[in-house]
């Protein structure tokens, strides 16, 4: 790598090549997909970087797809179309579900009665979610969130713990290797980690849009009432998750991105 490719991009592109070299994936029957925000970052060149890395390693027939809303960064591929209206509800439910499980896990792992209980529950509920997501049943994820809250309660001892939040660049916050596994170190010190939330990364788009429009940095392509309606729909789902989360004794609710 060099100073033209950021550290997260180096790791992500390297992981993709490493996955193919492991032999677990057939390059001829595999597609590489990555989300794109189009932000002012060298990682916005992910598509070209991934293509270059795959070609240089001999994987010339593996298509690379960009999952993006913005124009000019989609890298469209024939045979690959996303019905966003159909998949957005399950995407939202999946993001909130994973964030909810993270909240349960990090609060429980420093209070578990027996070592390993929290990790087993985390893995169980993440594995349980996979077929539900494939069947596109967002309401079922809400039901399993409630069951998870109940089960995480059962493994916890009543204990007060110091709390530490993880902040910073998005990839470093979520990838243990990238942040030298600081979360595990904190857990071993019996410090409760306040996990980063992937939902906040997407919810900030509502704030960013309003700021850019108010500062006349972006045209109003969509009426305000449409954006407000969409935000209320999303917030309604968040409120449902907060109600379910209350069943867990150490649950910290999702907050409004505007507060």
Outline where the language-model segments fall.
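An N-terminal assembly and electron-transfer interface module characteristic of large anaerobic redox
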Residues: 1-259
């Amino acid at each position: 790598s060099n100073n033209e490719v950021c550290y997260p991009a180096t790791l992500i592109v390297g992981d993709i090549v490493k996955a193919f070299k492991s032999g677990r994936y057939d390059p001829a029957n595999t597609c590489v997909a990555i989300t794109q925000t189009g932000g002012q970052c060298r990682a916005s060149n992910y598509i070209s970087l991934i293509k270059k890395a795959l070609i240089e390693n001999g994987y010339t027939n593996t298509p690379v797809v960009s999952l993006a809303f913005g124009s000019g960064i989609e890298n469209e591929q024939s045979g690959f179309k996303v019905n966003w209206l159909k998949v957005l509800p399950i995407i939202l439910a999946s993001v909130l579900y994973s964030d909810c499980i993270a909240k349960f896990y990090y609060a429980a792992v420093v209070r578990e009665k027996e070592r390993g209980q929290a990790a087993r529950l985390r893995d169980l509920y993440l594995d349980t979610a996979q077929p539900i997501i494939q069947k596109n049943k967002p309401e079922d994820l809400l039901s399993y969130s409630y069951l998870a809250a109940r089960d995480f309660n059962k493994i916890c001892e009543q204990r007060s713990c110091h709390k530490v939040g993880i902040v910073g660049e998005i990839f470093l916050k979520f990838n243990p290797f990238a942040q030298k596994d600081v979360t595990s170190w904190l857990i071993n010190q019996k410090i409760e980690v306040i996990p980063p939330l992937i939902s906040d990364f997407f919810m900030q788009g509502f704030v960013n849009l309003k700021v850019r429009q108010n500062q006349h940095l972006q045209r109003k392509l969509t009426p305000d009432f449409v954006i407000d309606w969409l935000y209320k729909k999303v917030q309604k789902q968040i409120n449902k998750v907060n109600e379910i989360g209350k069943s867990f004794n150490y649950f910290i609710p999702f907050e409004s991105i505007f507060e």
